Amino acid sequence: MSERKLFTSESVSEGHPDKIADQISDAILDAILAEDPEAHVAAETVVYTGSVHVFGEISTSAYVDINRVVRDTIAEIGYTNAEYGFSANSVGVHPSLVEQSTDIAQGVNEALEAREGQKDDLNLIGAGDQGLMFGFAIDETPELMPLPISLSHKLVKKLADLRKSGDITYLRPDAKSQVTVEYDDNDQPVRVDTVVISTQHDPEVSQETIRHDVIEKVIKEVIPTSFIDDNTKYFINPTGRFVIGGPQGDSGLTGRKIIVDTYGGYSRHGGGAFSGKDATKVDRSASYAARYIAKNIVAAGLAKKAEVQLAYAIGVAQPVSVRIDTFGTSTVSETDIEKAVRQLFDLRPAGIIKMLDLKRPIYKQTAAYGHMGRTDIDLPWEKLDKVEALKQLIG
């Protein structure tokens, strides 16, 4: 009898408190970059009942109306009703932003290599901090993402679409999903074992109605029928009631959903969050570059799955390490893949920014439903434009 292996990932909706915070931080980043592409931004947000606090470090020539950006973002998410305990019109907004530390700025604005006389424009920017970052890709889905996180994202995105379109009128913005996938002996996904969905709702609707609508209009519309069978388990609002939600139910903070933002736990994570950070922060830009590399490796047929680790020292342009792990699935040696990667991808912060055009205001759209594997928006790190070059270099 074959061994039954299960893997579970979760996602949360744009109305989840932590995701509200992420979206506000990235909306502020985008507003600044739209006026000043050279800005350095580290914007953190805390949300709770009736209040938003924005704090962090920013160096920019731009003027941004933080109050307006915060309120517009909250309204777009759907918190426009005072009954929710958190509303765009009535929430208190408390910004506390200061200039970036000069000690940090001197290493970011002029990398160690430039200070030592290595005259190259791409040596001008040093990494904004030390750290390690991971990127991952796997051939389980067309977007080369693990199936559990892919389905989890699509479920909460479908809930939001139905709420915003008015197709399900009783839904409120906060929601969570969790999908457990069963794998066979060859590590191929064969079925969905369990689906958990908790969705905020108006007080008068019955749980029977919610269960019916979520199964019929969300789950069955998102998960392919080939993965569903009579033994698939559904837990819909298993507490029995979810009226109080969003920041009224729980406080939210930027950077607390880093596993949701990436691969749902299927790959390793370096620990750094993304939202509110400009591209000189390698927590963000190098994670995108690592995904870009991993996705092109898998798309080129060099491996069935690939994990890329990058690591940096603060104020230094060149990464201190590059590691490729294909978990025994590669068709060529990992050493050859790593050599090709080093030759093809400039992994200095300025090189990544140039390669992926990261000075643009493109970040708010990534702050809910995942930064990786998105098929609904155009993201530069999801491009497959290095596939042929990788094949040619490796032969």
UniProtKB/Swiss-Prot annotation:
<dbReference type="GO" id="GO:0005737">
    <property type="term" value="C:cytoplasm"/>
</dbReference>
<dbReference type="Pfam" id="PF00438">
    <property type="entry name" value="S-AdoMet_synt_N"/>
</dbReference>
<feature type="binding site">
    <location>
        <position position="273"/>
    </location>
    <ligand>
        <name>ATP</name>
    </ligand>
</feature>
<dbReference type="InterPro" id="IPR002133">
    <property type="entry name" value="S-AdoMet_synthetase"/>
</dbReference>
<feature type="region of interest" description="Flexible loop">
    <location>
        <begin position="100"/>
        <end position="110"/>
    </location>
</feature>
<keyword id="KW-0460">Magnesium</keyword>
<feature type="binding site" description="in other chain">
    <location>
        <position position="281"/>
    </location>
    <ligand>
        <name>L-methionine</name>
    </ligand>
</feature>
<feature type="binding site" description="in other chain">
    <location>
        <position position="16"/>
    </location>
    <ligand>
        <name>ATP</name>
    </ligand>
</feature>
<dbReference type="InterPro" id="IPR022636">
    <property type="entry name" value="S-AdoMet_synthetase_sfam"/>
</dbReference>
<dbReference type="Pfam" id="PF02772">
    <property type="entry name" value="S-AdoMet_synt_M"/>
</dbReference>
<keyword id="KW-0808">Transferase</keyword>
<keyword id="KW-0547">Nucleotide-binding</keyword>
<dbReference type="InterPro" id="IPR022630">
    <property type="entry name" value="S-AdoMet_synt_C"/>
</dbReference>
<dbReference type="GO" id="GO:0000287">
    <property type="term" value="F:magnesium ion binding"/>
</dbReference>
<feature type="binding site" description="in other chain">
    <location>
        <begin position="241"/>
        <end position="242"/>
    </location>
    <ligand>
        <name>ATP</name>
    </ligand>
</feature>
<keyword id="KW-0630">Potassium</keyword>
<feature type="binding site">
    <location>
        <position position="250"/>
    </location>
    <ligand>
        <name>ATP</name>
    </ligand>
</feature>
<dbReference type="GO" id="GO:0005524">
    <property type="term" value="F:ATP binding"/>
</dbReference>
<feature type="binding site" description="in other chain">
    <location>
        <position position="57"/>
    </location>
    <ligand>
        <name>L-methionine</name>
    </ligand>
</feature>
<keyword id="KW-0963">Cytoplasm</keyword>
<keyword id="KW-0067">ATP-binding</keyword>
<protein>
    <recommendedName>
        <fullName>S-adenosylmethionine synthase</fullName>
        <ecNumber>2.5.1.6</ecNumber>
    </recommendedName>
</protein>
<dbReference type="GO" id="GO:0006730">
    <property type="term" value="P:one-carbon metabolic process"/>
</dbReference>
<comment type="function">
    <text>Catalyzes the formation of S-adenosylmethionine (AdoMet) from methionine and ATP. The overall synthetic reaction is composed of two sequential steps, AdoMet formation and the subsequent tripolyphosphate hydrolysis which occurs prior to release of AdoMet from the enzyme.</text>
</comment>
<dbReference type="Pfam" id="PF02773">
    <property type="entry name" value="S-AdoMet_synt_C"/>
</dbReference>
<dbReference type="GO" id="GO:0006556">
    <property type="term" value="P:S-adenosylmethionine biosynthetic process"/>
</dbReference>
<feature type="binding site">
    <location>
        <position position="277"/>
    </location>
    <ligand>
        <name>ATP</name>
    </ligand>
</feature>
<dbReference type="InterPro" id="IPR022628">
    <property type="entry name" value="S-AdoMet_synt_N"/>
</dbReference>
<keyword id="KW-0554">One-carbon metabolism</keyword>
<feature type="binding site" description="in other chain">
    <location>
        <begin position="256"/>
        <end position="257"/>
    </location>
    <ligand>
        <name>ATP</name>
    </ligand>
</feature>
<feature type="binding site" description="in other chain">
    <location>
        <begin position="174"/>
        <end position="176"/>
    </location>
    <ligand>
        <name>ATP</name>
    </ligand>
</feature>
<dbReference type="InterPro" id="IPR022631">
    <property type="entry name" value="ADOMET_SYNTHASE_CS"/>
</dbReference>
<comment type="subunit">
    <text>Homotetramer; dimer of dimers.</text>
</comment>
<comment type="pathway">
    <text>Amino-acid biosynthesis; S-adenosyl-L-methionine biosynthesis; S-adenosyl-L-methionine from L-methionine: step 1/1.</text>
</comment>
<keyword id="KW-0479">Metal-binding</keyword>
<feature type="binding site" description="in other chain">
    <location>
        <position position="100"/>
    </location>
    <ligand>
        <name>L-methionine</name>
    </ligand>
</feature>
<dbReference type="InterPro" id="IPR022629">
    <property type="entry name" value="S-AdoMet_synt_central"/>
</dbReference>
<feature type="binding site">
    <location>
        <position position="44"/>
    </location>
    <ligand>
        <name>K(+)</name>
    </ligand>
</feature>
<feature type="binding site">
    <location>
        <position position="250"/>
    </location>
    <ligand>
        <name>L-methionine</name>
    </ligand>
</feature>
<comment type="similarity">
    <text>Belongs to the AdoMet synthase family.</text>
</comment>
<feature type="binding site">
    <location>
        <position position="18"/>
    </location>
    <ligand>
        <name>Mg(2+)</name>
    </ligand>
</feature>
<dbReference type="GO" id="GO:0004478">
    <property type="term" value="F:methionine adenosyltransferase activity"/>
</dbReference>
